[in-house]
Amino acid sequence: MALATQSNRIKIGIRPTIDGRRMGVRESLETQTIRMAQSVAQLLQTHIRYTDSTFVECVVADSTIGGVAEAAACADKFKRENVGLTITVTPCWCYGSETIDMDPHMPKAIWGFNGTERPGAVYLAAALAGHSQLGLPAFSIYGTEVQEADDTNIPEDVKEKLLRFARAGLAVASIRGKSYLSIGSVSMGIAGSIVNQAFFQEYLGMRNEYVDMMEIKRRLDRKIYDQEEVDLALSWVKQYCKEGVDVNSLENQRNAEERAELWENVVKMTIITRDLMVGNPKLATLNYAEEALGHNAIAAGFQGQRHWTDHLPNGDFMEAMLNSTYDWNGVRPPYILATENDSLNAIGMLFGHQLTGKAQIFADVRTYWSQDSVERVTGWRPESGFIHLINSGSAALDGTGEHQDAQGNPTLKPAWDVTEEEAKRCLENTRWCPAVHEYFRGGGLSSQFLTKGGIPFTMHRINLIKGLGPVLQIAEGWSIDLPQDVHNKLNQRTNETWPTTWFVPRLTGKGAFTDVYSVMANWGANHCVATHGHVGADLITLASMLRIPVCMHNVSEKNIFRPSAWNGFGQDKEGQDYRACQNFGPLYK
């Protein structure tokens, strides 16, 4: 994806507020207050990254903020510096509403120092009251332990909240102003591919862009692509992409010449779709200056079925490759591309990528397998039921689990940590199977792999409900291993040409997490995103910034971090979330 330049990156603004009384009070606090700001900046600049791998940049106000004039000067500087979220820090009393961040669209947090010499907690409470009264929700950060006035260390509980806020806030700011590109329209009546502009504009601050799938066909026919890159890609594909089982009847199988043409077309489709999203300067040198610009798309969706796939190769290869962290150009950040133009799953993939820097798995929530059903079909009885996540398209090849952590365990890494060796192992453990003719008459190549077990994943999904708006579902759990013969039997009766993840959610014994069946039964749509790691708490924080209520999750209550104003909407966390989101409304409305 085209990278942001150093000058226009989203930055995190640090606002050191102070007691404005001169002639002794303010002067005695300057050093401590500035040190707090510097320590927060240092923490964030060594722990939070942009998705292109570089560490986040922080901007500290030119002076401490003791009143409205300095608050306004800080706001002006932050506008010039492209600050997208702010953290206010103070060890002392300050003048509440005179010193707060008043920007209605920027996520904001306040860290009030827990010390006895000066009332940092009192300012924190006063400022938060002002934020709530003005309808500008802010996050409260206050350590559990009293610190000495000269202690420059950030306590672990404070660090956790600062980092969670920063990850979520940076995601909010980074997607604002970008585009979602619909390539095609509604796929097979799937609700997620009925693109809802109000959701994108009012909740995410994003544009909607549209091109007909014929634009891909036009570029194929008129050779509007970089032929040198196509040649490189085809050579790379020949070396690293191995064909898998062909389950089609003999009359529907393609010969070697036809398969070569198929490979050439799907490679070109991949390059063309990327160019549609983010542009390609090389096209300008070919006298296609308009096409060279792209659509400023941070995410996209490809309709495919059925208007394209009944006649032309499906998008499985391009979706899988673009969503992965590796191709013929080497290791790079993934491009977010949803199969069947499921725009809501695309946003889930975008959230997961922005929070982690990692590639995402797009999947159908295909089958709940109970213990009895597995035993009846295979003769083997598992410890519990599990869910089969499988889809022909947008599962990143990183989902094989062929990356390794420091202990040698299977994992998924952010692009900046992926090695060439790990990327190649993902390819070695993937086969490209000819598309099933009955589904895809135009042919295609689907990735076939099995996700290794023992990897923590967070399954999540945004759904739109008329009269309510968007809601978010979250289920943290793990991939599991099945005995090879059991996997083969279950996979072959489903679709052995597609990628599979066997998933077990973490159960609570209550509600939607009473058992594995309940998770599947309460899922709100046919698709989900699987993000590596247990990131439900980060998703909850992100959703609260956008005013999207969470209808289902298995995250521990102690890890739920939302704006302090939510506390005014009752004591039940789920209910207060709905009431607060309804009260404050979409972030950009």
Curated annotation (Swiss-Prot):
GO terms for molecular function: arabinose isomerase activity; L-fucose isomerase activity; manganese ion binding. SUPFAM superfamilies: FucI/AraA C-terminal domain-like (SSF50443), FucI/AraA N-terminal and middle domains (SSF53743). GO terms for cellular component: cytoplasm. Keywords: Carbohydrate metabolism, Cytoplasm, Fucose metabolism, Isomerase, Manganese, Metal-binding. Mn(2+) binds at E340, D364, H527. It is an enzyme of class 5 (isomerase). It catalyses: L-fucose = L-fuculose. Pfam families: Fucose_iso_C, Fucose_iso_N1, Fucose_iso_N2. The keyword Cytoplasm applies. Belongs to the L-fucose isomerase family. It comes from the Bacteria. This is L-fucose isomerase. It comes from Haemophilus influenzae (strain PittEE). NCBIfam families: fucI (TIGR01089), PRK10991.1 (NF008220). Pathway: Carbohydrate degradation; L-fucose degradation; L-lactaldehyde and glycerone phosphate from L-fucose: step 1/3. One of its GO terms (biological process) is D-arabinose catabolic process. PANTHER family: L-FUCOSE ISOMERASE (PTHR37840:SF1). Converts the aldose L-fucose into the corresponding ketose L-fuculose. Its EC number is 5.3.1.25. Its cofactor is Mn(2+).
